[in-house]
Design a protein with these regions (language model features):
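Gram-positive cell-envelope targeting signals
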Residues: 1-43, 171
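A generic "folded-domain core" signal
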Residues: 29-229
């Protein structure tokens, strides 16, 4: 489903543009690295072949796409969640080569209709006895109906920060965690969906966090070499 990817590209492009405003990108990072032979990159001081290979290894379980000057890295487990009509949260990573950032997305799917949610709770622990709660509020949630699948999809993506990374860490360190999509009242009816954060989502979160940390420690040249070869 293209809506989720498009939302991420829009968010990533806007944030990277803001970060780079007034700053010219190095020529090496301005275009897909496939145009730059690795032999040329290897001659530069800031390329470590082992680091490049380590990034490539991490990308084995990641869906990689390039659009509008942005590399987007998404967990391959999102395909599982979408195909099985699940609701989930997932981090993602985006980069223009020089800058590396991570984002967050929340997605709900239902066959009966929209929930019309604009806030989501992350509940750590058992549902009826959770130990912590993080609430996310949103001004705009994208909604689209897919008639072939008879799915009402709602999705939001945004740039992540340290608090979001802390939330992900608490999820991964907990035995159980849930998402609660709090629907708005429409025509006197309010629908709320609660779903467990499953093992596939947890693995996807782990893969993205590991990739993000590795890219943060790499040089521009190492990232570009890994992305394009």
């Amino acid at each position: 489903m293209k809506i989720a990817k498009k939302c991420k590209v829009i968010v990533a492009s806007a944030i990277v543009a803001a970060l780079m405003a007034g700053t010219a990108l190095p020529a090496l990072a301005a275009s897909p690295a496939g145009d730059v032979p690795f032999a040329v990159l290897a001659q530069q001081n800031d390329v470590n072949a082992d680091k490049v290979q380590a990034i490539k290894d991490k990308l084995a379980n990641i869906d990689v796409s390039y659009e509008d000057g942005i590399w987007l890295f998404e967990s391959a487990y999102e395909d599982y969640e979408i195909s099985n009509n699940k609701s989930y949260m997932m981090p993602y990573v985006y980069s223009n080569g020089e800058t590396v950032r991570f984002g967050m997305s929340f997605t709900s799917q239902d066959t009966e209709g929209y929930f019309y949610w604009n806030d989501v709770d992350v509940l750590i622990g058992e549902y009826n006895n959770y130990t912590s709660q993080t609430n996310y509020k949103f001004k705009k949630v994208s909604r689209q109906y897919y008639p072939d699948d008879q799915i009402f999809l709602e999705e939001v993506s945004f740039g992540g920060n340290d608090e979001d990374m802390d939330c992900l860490s608490r999820i991964l360190n907990a035995d159980t965690a849930y998402l609660r999509f709090n629907g708005a009242k429409v025509n006197g009816t309010q629908r709320t969906q609660t779903t467990i954060i499953d093992s596939e989502s947890r693995q996807g979160m782990t893969d993205i966090i590991n990739l993000y940390n590795l890219l943060q420690s790499a040089t521009v040249e190492e990232r570009v070499a890994a992305f394009g070869t």
